[in-house]
Structure formats: structure tokens, C-alpha cells
Amino acid sequence: MRHLDVTAYQSAEKLLPHHRSALVPGGRVRPVWIDGGARFWYRSGTRFVLVDPAAGVRVPAFDHERLAAALATASGQNVDAAALPFAAIQMSGRTVEFAAFGGHWRCALDTYVLEGCEPRPTAAFVETASPDQRHAVFRRDHNLWVRRLADGKEWALTSDGRADHDYATAPDWWQNSVLVRKLGFATMPPAAAWSPDGTRVLTHRTDQRGVRRNHRIEALPADGGPPRLHTQRYAHPGDERVPLAELVVLDIATGAVVRASAEPLPMSVVSPVMTRWAWWAADGGAVYYLSRPREGRSLSLHRLDPGTGHVTTLLTESGATRVEPNQWAEGQAPMVRLLGGGNEVLWYSQRDGWGHLYLYEAGTGALLGQVTSGEWAVREILHVDETDRVVYFTAAGLIPDDPYRRTVCRIGLDGHDLARLTGDDVDHDVMVAPNGAYFVDSASTTATPAVTTVRGWDGRVLVELEHADITRLLATGWTPPERFRVKAADGVTDLYGVLYRPHHFDPAGRYPIVDTPYPGPQTNRVHPTFDPGILGHEAEAMAALGFVVVAVDGRGSPGRDKTFSDASYGNLGDACDQAAALRQLARTRPWMDLDRVGVVGISAGGHQAVRAMLDHPDLYKAGISSCGTHELRHLHAGHAELYHGMPGEADYDRVSNVARADRLAGKLLLIHGGMDPNVLPDHTMRLAERLITLDKDVEMLVIPGAEHLFLGYEHHLYRRRWDFLVRHLMDAEPPQHHITPLVFDADFLAAWF
């Protein structure tokens, strides 16, 4: 057996996510808004940059050399202007503050006189600060408390919280207790939203009485003590009891507690406050929230009077499958806007087969008109100019070559005068300033590095920020992925994906293939951007090892028409499109070796990886599943019921890897974190038990202290995955190489959170 050279692993390690910012300087701009959004600063490499869009100015936030010299004098430490010992600043007028060398400092930018100072009162990680930064709320003993930041005075806003019926908590799996402890915090921030004037708090009382309990054992607690039992509340599909959210408004001055006079909201997945399914009106005069039943086949908009608790239902839409306020469930706010002081509603719907905007009269629920239309989809509402009656948004499907690329558009609320503000054919990833005056635009494709600018609502570039430099990335042997189009297994539907050629590619060679799926339905596996996203970075590394790496968004994933996204309803994780894509690609690429195909996935992708091996054993010879959802009937109710269907209506055996384990023919590595609160370890244990009973060979790696993201263990996971693929697809012995553990720095954590 040949030995793979260690340089392959060294090259692959350089392409892991935590190295990305150093390899692609200028690839990402993370604005930190100041002056209400009128200006912002960001880090460009090791430099701090200040941007004033109204003035069209991009300048250094301060003189780095003078500040470094002043800090060195004041602290007695060596300070390099090209590597300042802080990653964040606070700017106010002509001063800048920062923390360094165990102290807090203020520098006057007129004189560069530096002095020690007390840090400004700020909210801790476990708190949620008011808009005016005067107060912060936090949880204590099942209740919600408030702290005055100026002097630290604390008082309780509720007093009747109890275990299983407490305030401002999300479902247990979302609390990420293991991960949060690793990061040094006691808990997640409360599920709470402040009124615009900072006087009241919208939250919910969380009712988890009678919810199913699940258990995990922490083998090695942080204190080194004996194994510890962890019990969490975790409802399964079809359970009678699921977590419920009882909306409540709290007045921090008077202590008034106003409870919504409506049924509590099913909350199996995440808090409606955290997902912005419940929010304050801009003037604080009302709370609006969305609700839907557990099966998700209707969606309603309600108005809550924060003074009385009275609830009025404004709109309800029903459908044959799930009705959604957007197709992307991870991080994006619902596409619902209240206009005209609450008299009109801008509403997202897929009723005509595509995701579009509709205008309603709030008082009567009457449809005033369809705002957008056509065989394309609205991706995000960016801004509504109520004076000019115009809505700005991103749309996907207007670029013929790639229906996933986003275009910035505007249209009148009467449905007329559609215009594209970005007239090119690249993707536009947009972030709107808090004051709504402009937007930061990152324009790229999967093969074209990002150009980041600030634009006004006429589409004009106000300030150029960054041109991503890929010189260092190219030096690693990286080549841009190929964006491809193939047919789905039905032979009709177009699918899109990316293909990474192996490093040192020779078209006369034959290369093993690694499929890297994620089926959604709440997120895409492939991004249309140059940055491949958190699910895509390891694909670049595996190409460095010598694999052809493929990723494709099959039917059932978001971003296209309603029929496309509904294709997986009742059949989650089906891999027929993955298999069809690989076979089509290989027909015109003889260097792809279909006799050596592997598949690697995590979470829902882990389920699909195993399902691919079970349903297509003639194609997939090796697979790796990390924290796979192998038994959907044991996943949290909110996800399974919404995307697969209710038990009794949907066939859960159809999507069970455990039920079809007898089909396994290839080499399989199962990985799971022993403390995973999201996809509980029993998913992998059940599959392993079934395979062992069937006398099937299977490798298994359980990392006792790991949660769903495996933070702190990634270096080991990467090596073990790579070793497995090298052995079983290359028929080679992997080198003796240990990957350096990842550091939880701000850039790395921002990629996840």
C-alpha cells in the first residue's frame, strides 16, 4: 500500500476555515455601526478602517503608528502598529477606546494623548441590552431580571417563574449549554426584545411541563468529578406536549406584567423572539407576531396591544404543505413589514408557486395587490421607502445562468416599475445600515473574489471598501470551483452545484470522488458567493488531498420555486439527485472515477450520506456521517413535523436509516458527540446497534464531550475523516500528521453565530 505524502495534509490544513481570512484579505467586511448607522468601522486585516458613506469617505480609523507609540509609552509594553493588541474599539466623537494589557484605554485623536479609563458600562454576554444602553435583562432562578448598567442595581421583572415554566428561555437544545460553558459563559442571553424607547421588554414564559425528557452522560466534567447526568426537555414528532411560548410584555419602571390574551405558540425548535417572529412596532405602540400550528400548513399575523394584552389576528394564509415567511429558516427575519403606522402589511407568500410579496390592508385583511411576480423569488426585503411607496429587495432567478445569485431590485408597492439596482450577473450579499440610508454590498461568484462597496438606494457606489486578494489562496494550490448545471433524477429539473478539482490536477489522471451533501430544507449546501460558507470549507481542503469534491443543491432545498422546495416533503434526505448528478458529471469528465466514490455529511447531511450508501450501494463505496439524523422520529418535533409531515400522515420508516440498515455494502464511519443536544447521540447508537446486529462492519467514533458543532475537537475530526477517505478511496496509508487545534477567535465564531 502506498503512503500519501504529508504535504497533502499540510496543504489541506491551510485551507480550513480558521485560515480563510489570512488567505483572502479583504474577503469579508463586518461593519460595526456607530452614530445610529450613519458611519461604521471594520477591520481590514490588522488595520481599523472608518467609513462615512454620506461623505463618500473611507479612511484609517486612527493613526495606527501614533496610537501604538502612545500605548507603548503608557503601558510599558512593546506595541506593533501592524498587530495592535486589541480586536475591537469604541469610537465617540474624536476619541477611541479599547482594552489591552489587562486595562481599558482612551485615546484623544486630536493629540494622541492616551490615558487609562474605566470601561463604559456594557451588557454581559448573558444579558440583552436596551437600545439606549441604560439597562440589560438577564435570567435568574427561572425569572427575568433587569440591571441598570450605570450603577449595577438589579430588580426582578417576574417572580412566578418555576422549573419547566420559566421566563425568556428557548428550548433546551437551542440553549447550547455544553457549547456555552466551553466559551466561558453560564447560559445563553435571554429571549427578550426591548421596546424602541427602552422602557418595556417583550419576552415569553416558556411552558415545558410534561415535555419528554432525554438524557446524556458527561463522562469527564470540567471539574474532573465523576460522570454527570444531563437531562433535557426534547419533544419528538407526534408528542402530545411540546415547548410553548406564552408572550408577555414587562414594564421595567412600573413592574407591570401584560400577558397576551391568546393561545401560546408551539416552540419545539427556537424562541419566536430570537427568530424575530415576534417584534415591536417602530413606535413601540404594538407588538406583532407570527404563529402557525405544529404541522405548519397555515401562517397568521397578529397584533398584540402591549398595554392590555389584547390580540387581533390580521392575516392568515393556508397551504397544502408548510407556509413560510421565507424559505431560509437560519438567521433571516420573516419577510413581513407593517406599513403606514400598521395600516398595511407587506407579506411574503409562495401561493403562485414562487416566493413573492403581496400588499394587504391590515384592518380588514383585504388583499390590495401582488407587488412582485414572475418566475423568480424574492430573497430578502431590504428597505421600504414609505414616502415614495417603493420596496427594495434581493431577488434570485433574474440571472439566467444561475438562479441562486441575488440581484438588488426595487419596485413600487403598486407592483409597477421593477428595476435592478445591480445590473451585473454576479451575486450580491447585502447588509443594510441600521438607519436604512445605504447598504454594504459584497459582489462575487463562486469563482470571482468579492468586491465590497457601500451603495445608495439608486444603486450608485458611494464608497469602495475592499477588493479580495486571493494571491495567498492561489499559492496553496487552490483553483476556483467549477459551477455546474445537471438534471435531477427526474431528468427534467435543473440542479446547480460546484466541483473542486484536486490539487495538481492532471486531466489524463483518474481521481476518487467525494460527495458533500446537505439536504436542507432550511438552508442551502452551496452558496453562490466566493466564500463557500461554513458547510463548504472542508471541500476545499479535501480537494487538496487529491479528491474531486462535489456539492449540489438537490430538490427539496430552498431558493427556487415552491415545487422544488416541497420535493423533500415526506421524503427528507433522499439522495437520488446526488447520485444522478455524479453520474452525469462523470460522463463528460473521464478523470472522475465512479468506482471510487465517497460521501461525507454532517447533521442532516450525515443522514443523507448514510442514505446515499443504503439506496445507491453500487455508487457510494465509503461514507462518513457526523451527528447524522438517522431516525427522524427521534428528532425535535418542530423540524420533523414541519419539513417531513406529522406522524400518521408521513411515513417515518421511509426516511429511517435504521430501518434500511441491511442494505449497507460499503465502508462506513459514524461519528457523534456524546453531549450533542441537537441531534441526540441515540441516532448514531441506534444505527450502530442495528448494523452490529446484522453483522455489518462499521467504524464508530464517539467524542464524549463534544456537542453538535464539535468545537474544540475539529482538528481530530478533520484528521479522522481524511484518514478514512484516504484509506478507502485512495487505497493509501495516510501520513502521520496532526492538525493544530483551532482557536475560538472572533472571526471563527462569527462564521457559526
Named regions from a protein language model:
Residues 1-432, 437-448, 454-455, 733-735, ...:
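Beta-propeller folds
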Residues 262, 277, 284, 290, ...:
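Serine-hydrolase catalytic core recognition
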